[in-house]
UniProtKB/Swiss-Prot annotation:
Keyword Flavoprotein: yes
Its biological purpose: Catalyzes the conversion of L-lactate to pyruvate. Is coupled to the respiratory chain.
Protein name, entry field: L-lactate dehydrogenase
Taxonomy, superkingdom: Bacteria
Annotated binding of substrate, by residue: 24, 129, 164, 278
GO biological process: one example: aerobic respiration
Active site: 275
Cross-referenced InterPro entries: Aldolase_TIM, Alpha-hydoxy_acid_DH_FMN, FMN-dep_DH, FMN_HAD, FMN_hydac_DH_AS, LldD
Alphabetical UniProt keywords: Cell inner membrane, Cell membrane, Flavoprotein, FMN, Membrane, Oxidoreductase
Gene encoding the protein: lldD
The UniProt record lists the keyword Oxidoreductase: yes
Length: 381
């Protein structure tokens, strides 16, 4: 099929990847209203077109936590990327490096930290969940530190798992899931060969290294469910702040008061995020939550935003709402599932070209030029 956008990659991934993995990435929680609003609230923001400005020196580069980024985007942490393409985390990390942006490895990746860092030269970011097993948290932090990971992304919006009903229908969970997955693999032969056979092992590399035994997808669901910690508070994060030498980013902020707490805590950055609509259905979309958070803490802490970004125009919209940079999740997973490393590289090229168009036609020559003036207040029309 012809690929011209991230939406095309979604359709290509739907055809190529078995339903249990496609819907794991594509779905949200409960009735998926927040998942839907993440996309529509962002897309509904009208850009303010300005003309006859010299845009010949347009530049999408930024500096974030001491790193040069070719554009204000970071590949977000996504669990089990190695089930979308053969050793998928390695392929995605290499694509990000080639396009000049960071890659963030999930705690629950297929490829372990050391396998990914050995395949790239650029320091990657590492994401950690709040878990009851502090021994695991310390173990994986030590490994991330030893491997040269530059920035820690601490996800705080999962003290309990969201109700992802679509997973039960797709075969990711629920009755007879093993049989259903096997049948799906038979009907997706390219994936079965490239990922199912040549992409082994399909264990969670970081978790398996700690437990000393292979932890597969089914074990991972149980293990995570048992280890989510609803008692976590800011005080519990202090030892992590003390242990980690580099920048620390708190992911999962939707309220200005929580953003202020992150500043008081001493975090270097926050990610305005509702976990891609996979946790609390009915929560604000990131686009709706971002402006008040930016008003509260802009300049005191770096603000990243994710959830709902499907093209380069959406990146510009997030920046206009107050973000310093963005994180891309589903968009790169679709491209990874459809075409591996080459797909992710092409997707990032598409996003960058779309940013060029949006910046040119809103007359913003540099990323720092983009403010809310780039948006039209439709309520006044």
């Amino acid at each position: 099929m012809i690929i011209s956008s991230a939406n095309d990659y979604r359709e290509a991934a739907r055809r190529r990847v078995p339903p249990f993995m496609f819907h794991y990435a594509d779905g949200g929680s409960f009735s998926e209203r927040t998942l839907e609003r993440n996309v529509t609230d962002l897309a509904d923001l009208a850009l303010r077109q300005r003309v006859l400005k010299d845009m010949s020196q347009l530049d999408t580069e930024i500096e974030l936590f001491g790193e040069k980024l070719a554009m204000p985007a970071v590949l977000a942490p996504v669990g089990a990327c190695g089930m979308y393409a053969r050793r998928g985390e390695v392929q995605a990390a290499q694509a990000a490096e080639n396009k000049g942006i960071p890659f963030t490895l999930s705690t629950v990746s297929i490829c372990p930290i050391e396998e990914v860092t050995a395949a790239i030269k650029r320091p990657m970011w590492f994401q950690l969940y709040v878990l009851k097993d502090r021994g695991f948290m310390k173990h994986v932090l030590e490994r991330a530190k030893a491997a040269g990971c530059s920035t820690l992304v601490f996800t705080v919006d999962m003290p309990t798992p969201g109700a992802r009903y679509r997973d039960r229908h797709s075969g990711m969970s629920g009755d007879y899931k093993e049989i259903r997955r096997a049948l799906q693999a038979v009907t997706h032969p390219f994936w079965a060969w490239d990922v199912g056979i040549k992409g082994k092992p399909h264990t969670l590399g970081n978790v398996s290294a700690y437990t000393g035994k292979a932890v597969g997808l089914d074990d991972y669901v149980v293990w995570l469910g048992e280890n989510f910690d609803p008692s976590i508070s800011w005080k519990d994060l202090e030892w992590i702040r003390d242990f980690w030498d580099g920048p620390m980013v708190i992911k999962g902020i939707l309220d200005p008061e929580d953003a202020k707490d992150a500043v008081r805590f001493g975090a270097d950055g926050i990610v305005v995020s509702n976990h891609g609509g996979r946790q609390l259905d009915g929560a604000l979309s990131s686009a709706r939550a971002l402006p008040s958070i930016a008003d509260a803490v802009k300049g005191d802490i770096k603000i990243l935003a994710d959830s709902g970004i499907r093209n380069g125009l959406d990146i510009v919209r997030m920046l206009a709402l107050g973000a310093d940079a963005t994180m891309l999740g589903r968009a790169f997973v679709y491209a990874l599932g459809a075409a591996g490393k080459a797909g992710v590289e092409n997707m990032l090229d598409i996003f960058k070209k779309e940013m060029h168009v949006a910046m040119t036609l809103t007359s913003n020559q540099k990323i720092s030029d983009i403010t809310r003036d780039a948006l039209v207040d439709l309520s006044k029309l």
